[in-house]
Swiss-Prot record:
Keyword list, A-Z: Cell membrane, Glycoprotein, Membrane, Receptor, Transducer, Transmembrane, Transmembrane helix
Biological role: Gustatory receptor required for response to the bitter in taste neurons. Gr66a cells respond to bitter compounds such as caffeine, theophylline, threonine or valine. Flies avoid bitter substances, suggesting that Gr66a neuron activity is sufficient to mediate avoidance behavior. Required for sensing and avoiding N,N-Diethyl-meta-toluamide (DEET), the most widely used insect repellent worldwide, as well as to L-canavanine, a plant-derived insecticide.
Protein name: Gustatory receptor for bitter taste 66a
An individual GO BP term: response to L-canavanine
Glycosylation, residue list: 496, 510
Provenance organism: Drosophila melanogaster
Tissue-specific expression: Taste hairs in labial palps, labral and cibarial sense organs and forelegs. In larvae, is expressed in neurons of the terminal external chemosensory organ, as well as in the dorsal, ventral, and posterior pharyngeal sense organs.
Main location: membrane
Transmembrane segments: 47-67, 81-101, 145-165, 175-195, 346-366, 383-403, 461-481
Keyword Transferase appears in the UniProt entry: no
Extracellular compartment residues: 68-80, 166-174, 367-382, 482-527
Gene from which the chain derives: Gr66a
Length: 527
């Protein structure tokens, strides 16, 4: 047991950089010293106070940001439709809601998340006993790549929007930095989930690779046994043919060969009717090829190499298969616990991604029509910045959905690999073992969902893509209808004003005519 503990590398050892950044940002409340010294995530009262303080600070700064840049929002309702105003008001706070959901969930689960990674460490020890050594160095590289990509996307969106679309001549414009805090914190939180999910997928694949290795080893063992069996010597075309009564009709067709010539030619090497050499036994000059000069047949495959197979002994391999299935069940339970810990943050992220993707495209359309848009969505005024924002937002959602789907597929593939062991061994006892374990594996697969509302798989991604397209078309149609109604009202008001002016002018003409008639009548002397 001590040897397994020394050989197994803790998974949390690869989270050093991510933990320090998350701790400074106020995402995790766990104790810093215990993680640095023993790679453990344990509760911390000071960490909880620091996390709540940063949460309150972020909320206050975000509201100050909205108030400072809200001049455009206050004039938005008067200049645009109520639909655009309501959408902008709701989506202005959805990023803040997502950030609060991430931090409060981390605060609630601060004790359970440490237990989760401890269970993963115990799984690694059990896999090590079965010959599966997990290499966690790839996880460390993935974390660094994700952190670098996060910084690049956040800085690209923040700097480009600040330079092109914000009046940075005023000192209040520095508050625009606060607009990047919710998405940055959300991304750091989702890196924890994504990397942990990837670690589970690697362990499923390690079990599948072990079962596939058993199958390959047994196939090599069968080839080795087949190679040691006696193989009949190859036919030599230089020797005279032996008589076969079943081929008598063929002998008559090949030059009138009689039955007696076969026996004589076998003894003396000559005969009256001798079958001419076939084409592949002659060279290009029509000369017979010497049998001694031909290339000898290849030797049997690895006849001097001994291949042992665990599947050849059903009683011996039963314990290994049982252990692998138990580890598989434990990984599935860890996956369910992981999904439960991040269920609300995943739901908020998917809702945020769906709404922001649709709204960003809608506000891009509004910007092309020279309409006012909410202040925090001013990035939609620039198509290049819009592409970066959409790539960043959709990339997080799509990657988590894809990784969840691949992890679920890897868990279900274990049953296929297990059945291959039974098929290649062709042993009744092993068949019974495989069938018994397969019944257990039916309940071991894991599926990831967002609070049970929808499953994180490719079908959901396809449905979300169609929903974004449909709602975007509906919003554009509503916007067109609102603009047409506004233009109609303006036209009607202008016609009323014109009609009023015409009526006033007509009345003035009538008054002038009446006054002229009165003066004329009064001033004219009576005859």
């Amino acid at each position: 047991m001590a040897q397994a503990e020394d050989a197994v590398q803790p998974l949390l050892q690869q989270f050093q950089q991510l933990f320090f950044i998350s701790k400074i940002a106020g995402i995790l409340p766990q104790d810093l010293e215990k993680f640095r010294s023993r790679n453990l995530l344990e509760k911390s009262r000071n960490g909880m106070i620091y996390m709540l303080s940063t949460l309150i600070l972020y909320v206050v700064l975000y509201n100050i940001l909205i108030y400072s840049f809200g001049e455009e929002d206050r004039s938005l309702k008067a200049s645009q439709s109520t639909l655009t105003f309501v959408i902008g008001l709701f989506l202005t706070y959805i990023g803040l809601i997502m950030m609060v959901s991430d931090q409060l969930t981390a605060l609630r689960n601060q004790g359970r998340i440490g237990e989760l990674y401890e269970r993963i460490r115990l799984v690694d020890e059990r896999l090590y006993k079965e010959g599966c050594v997990m290499d966690n160095s790839t996880i460390g590289r993935r974390i660094r790549i994700m952190l670098i990509m996060t910084v690049i996307f956040e800085l690209s969106i923040l700097v480009s929007t600040y330079v092109k679309l914000v009046d940075y001549s005023q000192w209040m414009s520095l508050l625009w930095i606060v607009s990047a805090i919710p998405t940055f914190i959300n991304t750091l939180d989702k890196i924890w989930f994504a990397v942990s999910l990837y670690a589970l997928k690697e362990r499923f694949e390690a079990i599948n690779a072990t079962l596939e290795e058993l199958v390959d080893t047994h196939e090599k063992h069968k080839l080795w046994l087949r190679g040691n069996q006696e193989v009949p010597p190859p036919l030599d075309s230089s020797q005279p043919p032996q008589y076969d009564s079943n081929l008598e009709y063929l002998y008559k067709e090949l030059g009138g060969m009689d039955i007696g010539s076969i026996g004589k030619s076998s003894v003396s090497g000559s005969g009256k009717n001798k079958v001419a050499p076939v084409a592949h036994s002659m060279n290009s000059f029509g000369e017979a090829i010497d049998a001694a000069s031909r290339k000898p047949p290849p030797p049997p495959l690895a006849t001097n190499m001994v291949h042992e197979s665990e599947l050849g002994n059903a009683a011996k391999v039963e314990e290994k298969l049982n252990n692998l299935c138990q580890v598989h069940d434990e990984i599935c339970e860890i996956g369910k616990a992981l999904n439960e810990l991040w269920s609300y943050p995943i739901l908020s992220l998917m809702a945020y991604g769906f709404l922001i993707f649709t709204a960003q495209l809608y506000f891009l359309y509004c910007a092309t029509q020279y309409q006012s848009i909410p202040s925090l969505f001013r990035s939609a005024k620039n198509p290049f910045i819009t592409v970066i924002v959409l790539s960043y937002t959709s990339g997080k959602c799509v990657y988590l959905i894809y990784l969840s789907w691949k992890t679920s597929q890897a868990s279900k593939r274990t049953g296929i690999s297990l059945h291959k062991c039974g098929v290649v061994a062709d042993d009744n006892l092993l068949y019974e073992i495989v069938n018994h374990l397969s019944l257990k594996l039916l309940n071991h697969s894991v599926d990831f969902s967002a609070c049970g509302f929808f499953t994180l798989d490719m079908e959901t991604l396809y449905g979300v893509s169609g929903g974004i397209t449909s709602y975007l078309i509906i919003l554009i149609q509503f916007n067109l209808a609102a603009q047409q109604a506004k233009e109609a009202i303006q036209t009607f008001n202008s016609l009323n004003d014109t009609a009023g002016l015409v009526g006033a002018a007509t009345d003035m003409d009538n008054i002038s005519s009446t006054l002229r008639d009165f003066v004329t009548t009064t001033m004219t002397p009576a005859v």
